[in-house]
Every structure is written in structure tokens, then in C-alpha cells.
Amino acid sequence: MIYGNALGAPAQSVQIPALVRQAKASGVARHIGRGLNRWSNVHIADVAALYTLAIAKAPAGTFMYVESGEEALAEISKAIATRLDLGAPQSWSAEQAIAAWGRNMAVFSLGSNSRVRGKAAADLGWSPTQRSVTRWIANELT
């Protein structure tokens, strides 16, 4: 999950804007089921820094994952609810999520796990400057 405010087009990532749109439209931030599914995440500026480093230093054909941590979707929806001054986030079923977000978004993006480790990036000398998606939501989400 890449988060942060980008400067180019499109200026939004996928998951967090979908969660925010739904929360604003309904007045309730939501997660699917218990929200225990986890996603590795990284700030867009840290991704850009890794691209720059990889172009300069990585051998051709190098494959890298990039992450600065991971978070459960329940914690992300809680941070969104707090930022938007809503009540506590609420769970909804997969069927409700599919009706709102469509099957691919609900099942593969907001209802699944995506956990990686950025070992190759770290071995290259990359280190993230932003480490918390929930802190970014609390302080910078617009």
C-alpha cells in the first residue's frame, strides 16, 4: 500500500482514498470483518527515493519489494475515523463491502493481506523516512 500526497496524476493511491470516500459518504469508517488483514505500506516519497537509488546502484534485473512497516485495516479505518471526526469504525461483511467497492477492491485490496519485506531495498542502502501510515492519516490526510 503506497500512501501520501503525490504531485503527479493521479494524485491518489488506491486503498486509502476508497476507504475515505466511503467514510465521508456514509459517516462511518469501515473495515471488512474484524479488520485483522494486514498490508505492508510505504510513503510515496520513500518509493521515489528508492527508485532513484535503484537506478544508480542496483544491478540490472534486480527485483525489490518496498515497505516501511505494515498495518491492520482496522487500525487504518480507526485512524480515518479519528481524522474525519467520525465515531468508532465499524465492521461490515464481505457482501456489503463488495456492494460498495466492487468485488476486486473488496476481496483483493481491502479484504486481503499483502505482506512483503524490503530486504533487497535495505541491502541497497535504502531506508524509509516515513514509518507510519496511521500517523500520516492523523496528520496529513486531506
Predicted regions and their residues:
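Glycine/proline-rich active-site loop of Rossmann-fold NAD(P)-dependent oxidoreductases
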Residues: G4-P17, L53-M64
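Amphipathic terminal alpha-helices
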Residues: R131-T142
